Regions:
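Extracytoplasmic substrate-binding proteins
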Residues: 138-214, 235-237, 245
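Bacterial Sec-type N-terminal signal peptides, specifically the leucine/valine-rich hydrophobic h-region
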Residues: 18-21
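Alpha-helical, coiled-coil/dimerization segments enriched in small aliphatic residues
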Residues: 217-243, 247
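Bacterial N-terminal signal peptides that target proteins for export
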Residues: 1-11
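Proline-aspartate-enriched helix->loop->beta-strand connector
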Residues: 110, 118-131, 147, 247-261
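Short helix-initiation/N-cap motifs at beta->coil->alpha
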Residues: 44-46, 105-119, 239-248
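A short, structured surface patch at a secondary-structure boundary
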Residues: 66-120, 128, 234
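Bacterial Sec-exported substrate-binding components of ABC uptake systems
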Residues: 2-4, 23-68, 175-206
Length: 271
C-alpha cells in the first residue's frame, strides 16, 4: 500500500511538472497582438483600401495636397513625406510661422517626376501613401511592401470635392472635409450668380503647372474656374495631358493678360 501511494504521488507530481512546463511554453510562445486596427476608405478609382484606423505617417505625392491635408487635419503632424515642390508653399509663407514641423518633412522619398522610392518609404515607416489616380504602378509596388495607397485627382470640380472627402475619411476628419466642400459650393454659387462668363471683353488667363511651361489650366478644375471667373483660357481646347508644354515664344505671341500657377515656381517667370 505504501509503495502504491508513493507511485501515485510520484505520478501526480510528474503530471503537475509537465503541466507547469507546458504552461510556461505556451506563455513563451504567445506574442502580443500587434495587429493594427484598420478601416476601409474608397478612393477615386473605387478601390476599397484598408488603411490604419489612426494613420500617423503619410506620404503625399500630389504637390498641392500636402497643404490640403494640413488644412483638413489642422497641422502637419501626420505628414511624413511630400513632393519637393510642395515645400515651396511653406518656405517664406504664412505657414512657416504657424507650423515648424512642416519644415522637417522628407522631400527625397518622392522624386520631382512624382515617382516614389519604395524602399525608402518602407524604411521611413510610411503607413499610407496618397497618389495621383494615374499612378497605378506605384500604388501596386507600395501595396506589395505593405503600404496602402489612395488614388485621388482634381481634373474636375466633382473629383476635387470627392478627393477632399477621401482625405477626410483617411484622417478621420470627414465633417471638416465636408465643411470645406460646403464652403466651396457657397462661394461658387456667388461667383456663378455674377455670370462673368457673359462678358465680351475677357482677360486671357494662362495657367501653368510649373516654370517648365507645362500647361495646367487646360486639364483640371482650373479650366472651369477661369471660365466662371470671366476669363478666357487660350489653351482650353488643347488636349489635356500632364506633359503638355508650350514654348516661351508662344507665350509672347499669346501675350496673356494673366499668368498664374498653383506653385511658387511661377516666380521664375517674372523676368
Amino acid at each position: 500500500m505504501k509503495n502504491w501511494k508513493k507511485l501515485t504521488a510520484a505520478a501526480l507530481a510528474a503530471l503537475a511538472l509537465v503541466g507547469a512546463l507546458e504552461g510556461c511554453g505556451n506563455n513563451a510562445d504567445k506574442k502580443p497582438d500587434t495587429k493594427q486596427a484598420t478601416k476601409i476608405v474608397t478612393d477615386l478609382k473605387g478601390r476599397e483600401v484598408s488603411v490604419p484606423q489612426d494613420v500617423k505617417r503619410i506620404a503625399v505625392v500630389p504637390i498641392p495636397w500636402a497643404s490640403v491635408i494640413y488644412a483638413i487635419d489642422g497641422s502637419s503632424e501626420r505628414l511624413a513625406a511630400i513632393h519637393p515642390a510642395a515645400m515651396s508653399a511653406y518656405k517664406g509663407k504664412f505657414l512657416e510661422n504657424r507650423d515648424k514641423h512642416f519644415a522637417q518633412l522628407d522631400t527625397k522619398i518622392i522624386a520631382q517626376n512624382f515617382s516614389v522610392n519604395i524602399e525608402s518609404a518602407a524604411q521611413a515607416g510610411i503607413d499610407t501613401a496618397v497618389l495621383w489616380q494615374y499612378q497605378d504602378k506605384d500604388a501596386e509596388k507600395l501595396t506589395k511592401v505593405g503600404i496602402p495607397t489612395l488614388l485621388i485627382y482634381n481634373d474636375t470640380v466633382e473629383n476635387l470635392k470627392k478627393s477632399f472627402l477621401i482625405i477626410g475619411k483617411l484622417l478621420g476628419k470627414e465633417e471638416r472635409a465636408a465643411k470645406i466642400n460646403e464652403y466651396y459650393d457657397t462661394t461658387n454659387k456667388k461667383i456663378i450668380a455674377k455670370q462673368a462668363w457673359e462678358k465680351t471683353d475677357k482677360p486671357t488667363v494662362l495657367f501653368l503647372r510649373n516654370a517648365k511651361l507645362r500647361l495646367q489650366g487646360n486639364d483640371n478644375f482650373m479650366h472651369e474656374a477661369i471660365r466662371i471667373g470671366g476669363g478666357e483660357n487660350p489653351y482650353g481646347q488643347v488636349n489635356g495631358g500632364r506633359e503638355q508644354t508650350i514654348a516661351m515664344e508662344e507665350i509672347y505671341k499669346q501675350n496673356p493678360d494673366i499668368i498664374g500657377s498653383l506653385y511658387n515656381e511661377i516666380a521664375h517667370l517674372k523676368n
